Curated annotation (Swiss-Prot):
Source organism of the structure: Epstein-Barr virus (strain GD1)
HAMAP family on file: HSV_DUT
Cited InterPro entries: dUTPase-like, dUTPase-like_sf, dUTPase_trimeric, HSV_DUT
Superkingdom as given in the UniProt entry: Viruses
The protein's name: Deoxyuridine 5'-triphosphate nucleotidohydrolase
Length: 278
């Protein structure tokens, strides 16, 4: 019988409660009030450090019934810094998350990376070696006005990998500027990538800029049937995200840089939020 992979983590935060660290998903809940101002990015320092098992990446997202949108972050194996959640206020006035109104989830997934000798259209090699996702660049210049949603159409079919599904995720660098990308499947006929500007400024993105990332999730992680080990709030109701069966192992030394893996994967370390550099 195959041993259950372990996610190593360290956590210490007086403002968050570790509600659950069961097989597959770790959940934190806010113990204090979080104020989100209109058209301003809010970051929540989690006091959480995590390392995925070999062959896995980590996914970080938030859920709430309040009018607040969370950036879905892809945590690369080489990232060694503190995890932080990026939130955007959907309203044009203050929103308040009272205690227990925000749940923060961390889960693992299996992935693969296609072998590309050269860049293929808008699909580029990642900035850091060992990153989970491929970089995807804009095919044209783009302007997003405050609270505007724009779709970018990509018609080039992505490289195929057996038993894996190409999926689009946003970048933390753009999310910090108020631009959130809605995760979605990239199918053979192309994909329409949806970007929303939650900031109070018009944001100009130049052609060829990295604006999202392409992650090849193992097909096991995408399902149309709900289960206690899946979440419809990550990718959407048509493709529920089902996390990998991993056990969480608390290793306090991770917060002090005792990562092991970080020594093997040089280059990223604490840069970015785990899903991109800034």
């Amino acid at each position: 019988m195959e041993a259950c992979p372990h996610i190593r983590y360290a956590f210490q935060n007086d403002k968050l409660l570790l509600q659950q660290a069961s097989v597959g998903r770790l959940t934190l809940v806010n113990k204090t009030t979080i104020l989100l101002r209109p058209m301003k990015t809010t970051t929540v320092d989690l006091g959480l450090y995590a390392r995925p098992p070999e062959g896995h990446g980590l996914m970080l997202w938030g859920s709430t019934s309040r009018p607040v949108t969370s950036h879905v972050g892809i945590i690369d194996p080489g990232y060694t810094g503190e995890l932080r959640l990026i939130l955007q206020n959907q309203r044009r006035y203050n929103s308040t998350l009272r205690p227990s109104e925000l749940k923060i989830h961390l889960a693992a997934f299996r992935y693969a990376t296609p072998q590309m000798e050269e860049d293929k259209g808008p699909i580029n090699h990642p900035q850091y070696p060992g990153d989970v996702g491929l970089d995807v660049s804009l095919p044209k210049d783009l302007a997003l006005f405050p609270h505007q949603t724009v779709s970018v159409t990509l018609t080039v079919p992505p490289p195929s990998i057996p038993h894996h599904r190409p999926t689009i995720f946003g970048r933390s660098g753009l999310a910090m500027q108020g631009i959130l990308v809605k995760p979605c499947r990239w199918r053979r006929g192309g994909v329409d990538v949806s970007l929303t500007n939650f900031s109070d400024q018009t944001v100009f993105l130049n052609k060829y800029r990295r604006f999202c990332q392409l992650v090849y999730l193992h097909k096991h992680h995408l399902t149309s049937f709900y289960s206690p080990h899946s979440d419809a709030g990550v990718i959407g109701p048509r493709s529920l995200f089902r996390w990998a069966s991993c056990a969480f192992e608390e290793v306090p030394g991770l917060a002090m840089g005792d990562s092991g893996l970080s020594e093997a994967l040089e280059g990223r370390q604490g840069r970015g939020f785990g899903s991109s550099g800034q």
